[in-house]
Amino acid sequence: MTTVSSREQINSAIGTWSGFIYQGLCGILTALKMIEADSAGVAGYKLQLDGYEDFSILDGTDQIVSLHQCKCIKGRTEYAEDLNKMKIKRDSLTNKRPDIKSYFHCNETVAMVEGLEIEPYPFKNGKTKCGPGELKSIIKGLTCKVPCLSYPKIL
């Protein structure tokens, strides 16, 4: 049996890569849910990955609508430090737009910190945790429901 040293585990890209996949799935789900809820109202909105946060939703004038932090770590439910950093980042941006929403996406139920105005993301049917496999299933279901939008023809 081969063992991996703690140094190799720390430097491994496996956790980071799966984190990027989870982040992307959460971004796609969020965008699809917004389109399903109000396709005309979000026309021109943008999904920005790895900008202000793990991902952000920007309106048609590039103003931040919401910030999203994503964590997919098995067994971990305590993220107070990450939540506090997210609040500081949001507070530094609210002078431009005071109504920025903040959401935390996770594969586990997270102990949220009161007073930070960061909400666990509502995935489906009130659930506030969702793993990658279930995310893919929800996304697949939403792609069948989302209305087609008219976009300029690209050559």
What residue spans do the PLM features occupy?
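Acidic metal-coordinating catalytic centers involved in nucleic-acid phosphodiester chemistry
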Residues: 1-18, 71-155
